[in-house]
Regions:
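General small-molecule cofactor/ligand-binding pocket signal
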Residues: 33, 102, 188
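Catalytic core of membrane glycerolipid acyltransferases/transacylases, capturing the structured
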Residues: 51-108
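A short, well-structured juxtamembrane/interface segment
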Residues: 24-50, 62-63
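Short N-terminal amphipathic alpha-helix/helix-capping patch enriched in small hydrophobics
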Residues: 18, 37, 56-59
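Pre-Walker A (Motif I) flank of P-loop NTPase domains
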Residues: 47-54, 125-128
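Residues at the C-termini of beta-strands that transition into short coil/loop
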Residues: 36, 83, 105, 161, ...
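Secondary-structure boundary motif
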Residues: 46, 69-72, 123
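Non-catalytic C-terminal accessory region of glycerolipid acyltransferases
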Residues: 1-20, 25-30, 42, 96, ...
Length: 230
């Protein structure tokens, strides 16, 4: 693992404002044509309890913008970021935007990591953002971890997606989307889902599929809002 040397620390300190400027440049030039389903956010916010925002890894760019709007409303949004030096710039950006940085651990087992996230949600009252098919895919396949976390904490899962009428698609496993300047953006938010306690492992699959289908439908709906049928 690479170490955080003084030279690398200086480089990251210099890069942070540049990256932040580029994010804000694109965010500020894009036009939000619709945010569909905000009543679900209002419903969750009224409980004053943590929740788990979920979206596809490729949607991270503009869903992060929406998370910033929730932070401005006073919601305690957390971002799970790699503990390696590669996570240093994302961590600094998340802090600048007012988010809570949750640094993972490369030495944690699955059970230990789940216990850590339980503490983040239940004891600290943080709503941890999840890219539910990440960090390595397969693309648009909802991972079981979010289902387990909702069951354990009783925090509702909140699915959301976005689409841009003009965008760059990176040649990565997730085809990461970066909207082009002045693109039209639609954000879609689905109904929250809390996974009941007391279910056996084999009973969780329907909930995983429900969230997977919800995100896929929200993705299609967002696309239809920025690419209306002729």
């Amino acid at each position: 693992m690479r170490e955080m040397t003084p030279a690398r620390r200086l480089a990251y300190a210099l890069l942070k404002p540049i990256v932040n400027f580029l994010f804000n440049l694109i965010w500020s030039t894009c036009r939000i044509v619709r945010i569909d389903g905000e009543e679900h956010v209002e419903q969750i916010s009224a409980t004053h309890k943590p929740f788990i925002p979920c979206y596809w890894h490729q949607h991270h760019f503009f869903c992060t913008w929406y998370m910033r709007q929730l932070i401005k409303r006073g919601l305690k949004i957390g971002f799970l970021i790699s503990p390696s030096v590669d996570g240093e710039i994302p961590a600094r950006l998340a802090q600048k935007w007012g988010g809570v940085v949750i640094r993972g651990s490369t030495t944690r087992t699955g059970a230990q990591a789940m216990r850590d996230m339980y503490n983040v949600v239940v004891k600290q009252g943080i709503s941890p953002v999840s890219t539910s098919d990440g960090p390595t895919g397969p693309i648009h396949v909802f991972k079981i971890g979010d289902i387990l976390l909702s069951q354990l904490t009783q925090a509702p899962l909140l699915p959301l997606a976005y689409a841009a009428n003009r965008a760059w698609y990176l040649k990565s496993w997730d085809r990461f989307i970066i909207p082009k300047p002045f693109a039209r953006i639609a954000i879609t938010i689905g109904a929250p889902l809390t996974v009941p306690k007391g279910l056996m492992a084999e009973d969780l699959e329907p909930y995983r599929l429900q969230m997977q289908n919800s995100l896929r439908e929200l993705t299609e709906k967002a696309a239809s809002l920025v690419h209306p049928a002729p």
